[in-house]
């Protein structure tokens, strides 16, 4: 007499295990791209938040001293997929701004020749595709539609209307710069 006839078998068949593995694979194929996009959105928020903080610091400095302060590209290395220490190479310490910890983006403020208008921008290649993502804030001269009396600020990634190779022509808002500078929305 066979002693296994009265006992029921416990466990999963190979087919059942293969179905579970296939379902997990499908879920991973859906979840991983969404997770990567979520990470890129989180990295992007650093640039937007810090541009807004620079704007606040510039306005506070202007209300006290009547002039805006230029900020050299800081950190001097290009923004990338990895965080780097923020090193102020000029200007940001004067207005009292420094980001917390390390940063993905590099930041710059260019002022008009009469120091009554400025453009702040942030740039980084956070997705590693070789093209920088750029965010900016354009503060025009009082009552004006261009930055500065003559409408020039020199070379900067994100520029306003009336400036050669204009990109972001909306004033007083933190917005993505010209789309040719990389994907700004994920």
What are the language-model segments listed below?
Residues 9, 21, 117:
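Short coil/loop residues immediately preceding or within conserved phosphate-binding loops
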């Amino acid at each position: 007499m066979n002693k296994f006839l009265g006992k029921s078998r416990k466990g999963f068949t190979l087919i059942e295990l293969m179905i579970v593995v296939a379902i997990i694979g499908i879920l991973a194929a859906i979840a991983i791209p969404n997770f990567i996009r979520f990470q890129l959105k989180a990295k992007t928020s650093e640039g937007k938040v810090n541009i807004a903080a620079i704007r606040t610091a510039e306005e506070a400095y202007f209300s006290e001293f009547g002039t805006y302060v230029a900020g050299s590209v800081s950190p001097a290395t290009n923004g990338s997929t990895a965080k780097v220490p923020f090193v102020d190479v000029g200007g940001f310490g004067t207005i009292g701004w420094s980001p917390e910890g390390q940063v993905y983006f590099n930041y710059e403020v260019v002022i008009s020749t009469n120091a009554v208008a400025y453009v702040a921008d942030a740039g980084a290649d956070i997705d590693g595709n070789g093209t920088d993502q750029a965010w900016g804030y354009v503060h025009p001269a009082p009552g004006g539609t261009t930055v500065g009396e003559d409408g020039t600020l020199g070379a900067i990634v994100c520029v306003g209307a009336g400036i050669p190779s204009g990109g972001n022509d909306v004033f007083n808002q933190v917005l993505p710069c010209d789309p040719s500078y990389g994907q700004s929305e994920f």
